[in-house]
UniProtKB/Swiss-Prot annotation:
The chain crosses the membrane at residues 209-229, 243-263, 333-353, 361-383, 404-424, 521-541, 574-594, 607-627. InterPro entries: Anoctamin (IPR007632), Anoctamin_TM (IPR049452). Belongs to the anoctamin (TC 1.A.17) family. Keywords: Calcium, Chloride, Chloride channel, Ion channel, Ion transport, Membrane, Transmembrane, Transmembrane helix, Transport. It comes from Oryza sativa subsp. japonica. This is Anoctamin-like protein Os01g0706700. One of its GO terms (molecular function) is chloride channel activity. May act as a calcium-activated chloride channel.
Amino acid sequence: MREGGAGEGQGAAVDEATGFEVGIVVPKLYRGAAAGCGEVENCVARLVRELEDVGLIVERVRGVPAEFIKLSAPMGTLGRVAAEMNMKKLTYIGMELQFEWDQVGAFVRQPDGSLFSWRERFACFRHLIYSIVNKTDSDITLSFDDKEFHWTQNESLLTRLEDEGIVKLVFPLHDEIKRKQLLRSWALKWFDFTWQPIDEIYSYFGTKIAIYFSFLGMYTRWLFFPAVFGLATQLIDFGSLQWLVLPAFFFFVISWAVFFLQFWKRKNSAVLARWGINYSFSEYKTMGNELDPLSFSMADDNVQQRKFGAPKEKSIVQRNEWFGVLLRIRNNAIIVLAIICLQLPFELAYAHLYAITKTEALRYVLTAVYLAAIQYYTRIGGKVSVTLIKYENNQGEQSSADSLVYKVFGLYFMQSYIGLFYHASLHRNIMALRQVLIKRLIVSQVLENLIENSIPYLNYSYKKYRAVHKKKHEKESPAGKSVRLSTRVEKEYLKPSYTASIGEELEDGLFDDFLELTLQFGMIMMFACAFPSIFCFAALNNVTEIRADALKLLVMLKRPAPRDAATIGAWLNIFQFLVVMAICTNCLLLVCLYDEEGKWKIEPGLAAILIMEHALFLIKFGFSHFVPEEPAWVKANRGRYVAQAQNVCSKQLLRSIAKLDAKLE
């Protein structure tokens, strides 16, 4: 991008322009067919002309698989569109106000100096291209190849072309300069371990992806502490104090997890403040959707005379609230029954087969087959979850996405841990449990990384082969001439999208990445006492995961469409739930380790374990209140912004009152 800093003034800002950040894909016509359109105007040529008329910079690229229309926009064009969309942006007094291009200097710039974030720019692009409508008094006849159709009055041109199958795809384009910079400073810097340029990631990919990598980096750094402690418990002989090692490690791990999650909340709020994102306002906008049914019911001539506190409006809101709660209870009950009746027997059968299998090689094969087979079951469960969510009264897309997260995690929770519970509680064989943990962690991580990195590459290679093969057999192609993809945009078009394996209409690819992370966290936390050095495997895997995910996003996939998410959402609640589960399961493991006779009596040792369990629950809920969720400087800035806003509003109100008094006199 070619965006300048905040001090260059509005005149310079008008001349700034983004890079080519959006692409439109249309079928490629033979040159003769494209030239001989007859009297009827070609629809692609009309689309290009309309895009230029609304102020966009257009470049047409004729590639091997299709023709591409690349779009860029001057800052002045984006500014006028943002004002037309009533876009809210943070000002220097801390208030989010409706954007006005004439007052551009009042609005906070992004960390990279640009006026608009990637999410805001992409929203402006989509609004521009989809708001091109037929403003004439009659229908317009357009053609493509031998096909003719009518563009009716007040109809979106791009939507009509999509319905006709002419526009195949509208997708974000990589900025080649920034992409290469991130490759050098982030994806290929393996020796930086957990350090990442989070501000640059935010500027390029948007809030949601940047928050994920910020969380992954902090989680990996904090993993080194239990990894060192866990390794020490395996390598060092503590002599007569050996019996205290595992309880001490258990106490340390739970305290570590509680502090980590609490300090993540602090970092999350600090990062949002640095990016100029008002999270409380985002929550307000999401909660505002809850009043949509009410607003429709009040849409009449006397709406301004109504009061929100009227009994009718209260009853409408309460009815919608409880109806949504009952729908969620019903759908969650369906998922729980499906897990108990269908998945639980399958998981127990696998655990039993694993226990009776004697050969290690066969156990690895059995685990691999099980992990592959369970994918189909979870995909079916995910589709059922998406269908159920459509009938829930969720307040907005984020609420629906959170509901999907909870339901799908329930399926994976049973899948991932029931076999481990089987070995821990029924057989009480800690050595067998350690072997299962190692196999699960190694096999699952190898399979996940193999799928994540190989399938996108194979998908791209297959699409590339098909496009080149098709081009060689076209009439225009000269015989014997080699055909290859020569432009960046056509290579990006053939790459897979960053989508979720389950419920892609609600979530992007971060769903799978967060799911993998939570399952790993649950495994290392709930069975920490059985295998303390498992934290070393997790830390090593996550260091690799940071760079592998970065390469995946920058090299192997299309640029993801930005999503507005200021936190990790429902995943944080799942992490906290897993900490509570870890307290229970590790107490059970300590009972199995110290109750060698299997009498399960409340002797002093077992009583001490129960006391420890209650103490850890107290720590879990107590430490959360001792560590503030926001740093002091964030609270101080908010207070200063509130004071500034009150001062400005009071002065403006006094001026308005003075002008009114002058008119009355």
